[in-house]
Amino acid sequence: CALPICPHVSVVMNFTKPTAEKPALLTLGEVETFLHEFGHSLHGMFANTRFESLSGTNVWWDFVELPSQFMENYAVEKDFLRTFAFHYETGEPLPDNLIERIVKSRNFMTAYACLRQVSFGLLDMAYYTKKDAFTEDIIPFEKEAWKKAMIFPQLPDTCMTVQFSHIMAGGYAAGYYSYKWAEVLDADAFSVFKKNGIFDQATAQSFRDNILSKGGTEHPMTLYKRFRGQEPTIDALLERNEIKRNVESK
């Protein structure tokens, strides 16, 4: 049949229930979760491909979280919050200084958190790029893999590998880096919206046409560069996380 098939997409959430005194009020975390899942749903709703197996979220593993994490950026954008974030009794909008404090608190120790995720990705790749059978002591192997990203000394008699279920039984073998890579992509993509306006229709249409509608029909970097005009850099992520780059090592 040549007729297009419209997708059926649902977002199923577990929100805080109302009480006798208060209606159901969303926490910031619930708003972020909704936006995240809504990003996945947009990927499916805007799909325009011939084959279902290449539509929507059926993309490369390290590209699937771009639309979802991209949408999370709106959760702390003042212009977005002004469209709905009002006190349920007084109608008072969410104060700007409160939003700023939330952002500041989220960025506490963010550089350490970043390197922690990078270290996990390095360990993952160290295991899955090893050509010979593993016959070594695990702890020295971990330290060698982590030496580029380790800030604090490892506690004696601790071992990450034995609890690293993501790469052993969770489907992230040789793919744990995709968590941090998705952050690089979503921050870089959202920087275009920050520049042009977070509700700019032309920018949104380009994101839809070049990324959301294409699914897995082309290489992710081809799609991304078509939208962005260049490959992603880490600059937007560092700026969002308020991490100062060492100019000498740039």
Question: Where in this protein do the model-derived segments appear?
Answer:
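Cation-handling catalytic/transport regions enriched in His/Asp/Glu
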Residues: 2-250
